[in-house]
Amino acid sequence: MSDNSTETQTETQAGGNGQAEAAGRQIVVHAQYIKDLSFENPNAPDILIDPPQQPDVQIGVNVGARGLNSEQYEVILSLSANAKTEDKALFLAELTYAAIVSAPGASRDDLNPLIMIEAPRLMFPFARAIISDMTRDGGFMPLSIQPIDFVAVYQSNIERQKEALASSETDGEA
């Protein structure tokens, strides 16, 4: 597969905006795959006979990455959907979806945002379709997860890392 494949995100018109320039850097997706997939339907078939009108659905999302070699990274997008009514669990869907990516020519400063923001953004439509199919195949209406702000997820992960580091430094001084 060449670096000019249709699976690359091409540079965008930056117009002098540094953030747009960073977002326009090239990222290559070499492979996408399911690492783990789980669907629990604990109250079937009873819940399917008389389904509730408006269940409470909680969506969880997390992003992680690890280096595979000097050029490639495995990006892991974890999605969970937990649906319940006041007294019954409807379903629990969990997906760990991964991709092998590289960012040729990216500077060290641009690499982390490309891996942790742009790669999950490219992976999300595929992961969302898997969750939707899984809930439909489980006997429920297909769950369509709304678009996710991966910049906010990235910033939240950085804040958690800073808090954990500060906490460990405080614990070490005591």
Functional labels for PLM-detected ranges:
Residues 2-122, 128-174:
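N-terminal intrinsically disordered, cationic/polar leader segments
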